[in-house]
Amino acid sequence: MYAVEAEMVMKYERPLAAPHVGAWLGYPADAKVLLVHADDMGLCHSVNVATLEAVKGGMVTSASLMAPCDWFVEAVELAKTYPEGDWGLHLTLTCEWKTLRWRPLAEASAVPGLLDRHGFMHRSVLDVAAHATPAEVETEIRAQVEHALRLGFRPSHLDSHMGTLFATSEFFEVYRKVALDYGIPYMAPRVPPAGSSPVETALYRRFATYTPQLVEAGEIVHDYLQTDTGGQGLEERIAYWADQVRGLRPGVTQFIIHCGQEVDELKAITGSYRSRTWDATAWQSPQLRHVLEEEGVILTTWRELARRQPRWRGGVEPEIGE
């Protein structure tokens, strides 16, 4: 007990000396540690159900909920039925859909820059960056955390829908500030991902200038982040993810997936309903389970990573109350 604690404190004092975050957190230097994380719970009923089923399956190890969405309350209630799950808060400043629209939780007069001409959230990250102030962003993300807490839900971590909180250095600073104020770990990879779009790639590359100081401060809990996906059809999707698992590097990696069901509700929202169904099914398949075992991958959660991280050990246990 004491030897382990002493070793972790020693590593905390010299985190940049470790070959990767995983080694600093106490994993073997050659260990491939993986978070499989489902975004967008709260978007709609079918996404909620599909995400819960995937998390219960065991290979999807974490998920995050969107507080401004109409189905957020149901998402929290479903999370309460499975407290063993690892549930975070997907801080949301955009609403990209054509017919499904939501508004900020903060008073409109307090966050005018977050509103489009119809009073909804902007559809794009660039619009948020062009119109919103850091103060407005902070007001809104605090409102989302407070809304979750009022519902008896203390998230295991915070992350950012569409990467909006990485759009400017000022947005990132308020994201970090709110996380530290509440004592909740926040998603920030040591190595920026290639991403699935030029905009996303640019966002994370801008953030990369911060990573050494964040590692040194003990706030980074994973090395690599993968936000894109591939493969048309279920079999190709399984093969795609199998290849990604086989290509894992030593350290802590987070895969981001999106779960859904092929039902009319989700079809009415997005043309990517099939892709969400493929992700949900792939990550409950025996084929991927076999590849994970074959590659010796260690599946983990945000809670476990935070427990290993001296910066967050004091307040990581999520609470899902009545």
Regions found by a protein language model. Name each.
Residues W102-A129, S272-R274:
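Active-site gating loops and adjacent loop-to-helix segments of metal-dependent hydrolytic enzymes
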Residues V33-L35, V60-S64, E84-H90, P155-D159, ...:
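Structural preference for beta-strand elements that scaffold enzyme active sites
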Residues Y186-M187, I269-E322:
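C-terminal domain-boundary segment and adjacent tail
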Residues T51-G57, F72-D86, R103-D116, L149-R150, ...:
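Acidic (Asp/Glu)-rich catalytic clusters
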Residues L25-K98:
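Active-site beta->alpha N-cap acidic-glycine motif
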Residues M1-L35:
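N-terminal pre-catalytic segment of deacetylase/amide-hydrolase enzymes
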Residues P134-E219, G231-R237, R246:
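Catalytic domains of cell-wall/extracellular-matrix polysaccharide-remodeling enzymes
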Residues D39-M41, M66-P68, H90-E96, H161-G163, ...:
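Active-site beta-loop-alpha junctions enriched in small/polar residues
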